[in-house]
Regions:
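Calmodulin-binding basic amphipathic helices in cytosolic, intrinsically disordered/coiled-coil regions
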Residues: 24
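Extracellular carbohydrate-recognition regions
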Residues: 21
């Protein structure tokens, strides 16, 4: 009866000064309406109060290991909480194609501020180390191929003379 699904919108963000204070507040918070955030995790321009549209919806429309897509319907600004572990090293969020910050919510989950009339929130796992590793792999493969060609070239002319 207390499950909130893959994503939901809250009407309030409650900030706490320390992780201990946040953990203590977890036992007393109604997560259906309130999200807990550490002071230093919340950008200064974020609103802490939201008036929820009674018809507002957020649904998971696509789920892959490295990509999650949510469809959003709201006529008022909102704050969405996602039942996904907050892992800042590699996960990027976009809202209608524009990058948005991912906020650490309720100590372990993700949150995103949603403006009125937004339609798609997408999370992608794109860690920098994977991109660097891919570049290094292609560079190594290229150098290996060049080495083979150079050795083959010299062997060919060595056997001809």
């Amino acid at each position: 009866p207390n499950a909130l699904g893959p994503a939901w919108m809250v009407s309030e963000i409650e900030t706490k000064a320390t992780p201990d204070a946040l953990l203590e507040a977890l036992n007393k918070t109604d997560f259906k309406t309130t999200a807990l955030v550490l002071d230093h995790d919340l950008p200064a321009d974020f609103s802490k109060q939201y008036t929820l549209d009674s018809l507002a919806q957020i649904t998971l429309s696509k789920a892959k290991p490295d990509q999650l897509t949510y469809r959003v319907q709201t006529t008022t600004p909102a704050f969405a909480v996602f039942s996904e572990m907050h892992y800042p090293k590699g996960w990027k969020a976009t809202l209608d194609g524009k990058p948005v910050p991912i906020i650490n919510v309720n100590y372990v989950l993700r949150g995103v501020q949603v403006p009125a009339n937004a339609s798609v929130i997408e999370f992608r796992f794109e860690p920098a180390v994977i991109k660097q590793g891919t570049r290094l792999r292609w560079l190594s493969l290229g150098l290996f191929a060049i080495s083979i060609l150079v050795l083959g070239y010299f062997e060919y002319f060595k056997t001809r003379s």
